[in-house]
Amino acid sequence: MTRTAQLLPHHPATFRPLAGVRVLSLALNLPGPVALARLRALGAHVRKIEPPSGDPMRSMSAALYRAMHRGVAVQALDLKTEPGQAALHEVLRASDLLLTAFRPPALARLGLDRATLSAAHPHLSTVSIVGHPGRRANQPGHDLTYQAEAGLLDTARLPSTLLADMTGALVVMEAAMGAVMQARASGCGVHLQVALSDAAGFAALPRDVGLAGAGALLGGGLPGYAVYACRDGLVALAALEPHFAESLARIAGGASRAAIARWCRTHGAAQLEALAAEHDLPLRAWPLERAKPRRPGQVNT
């Protein structure tokens, strides 16, 4: 499996609920292109317009850019020129949905604000990706600042993944499919806004209600739901349900944190994986070369 294999949903090839839906995207970087790729996987006919300088993601990660744009017709246009605008509106006339990732003033300068588009293309639905909702939509930001605002950064280290962007891409998909469905029913375009800071807040919800996070039930409060050191690496245990907890206690020689830690220390990653398969335990172990915990104190030894 390639590193980008998880980009697309693993549905049967015959599952194409968006067949016949025509989507145009002007969104650069990560959330918009990820959403576009997944809409294409569901059968939508997708196109993308990039500025003459291209999408910055191409230089940041060529492999991810290629994966996101496989099967996408990409066209370079300067939307600040009359020829570029004429070409854009020709595509919009044949589109059902437009994805953008500009701040509101930039949309207005390009003639892509809601009022202008509704007048020119009343059938067209739009999903506008912004950093923050409502009156804060013009405030700049990126994944890191959205995670910080949501309280998802608990050290000075950078996060290990772009959680707000990737979660945001799924929210964009949800909005896109909902807009298409309502527009089909009403005959009128639907205009929605997705804020990436809201997506980060959504991802933070389990922490906010006290379910996850340091010291919470799923943040180290349960001995059977934790990360331990094993003989040659690390092991993640998720024996949450009673039958899993009972199986773990039986093979570990006890249910206490000390008993589980001792059991993990005396086995290697491969041994623990084999035991997990034999006893139907939710466990994943990996050897030392991959075991580089980012936050000291999260690993039980």
Residue ranges of predicted features:
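Alpha-helical interface/anchor segments and their boundary "cap" residues
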Residues: 206-257, 261, 266-274, 282, ...
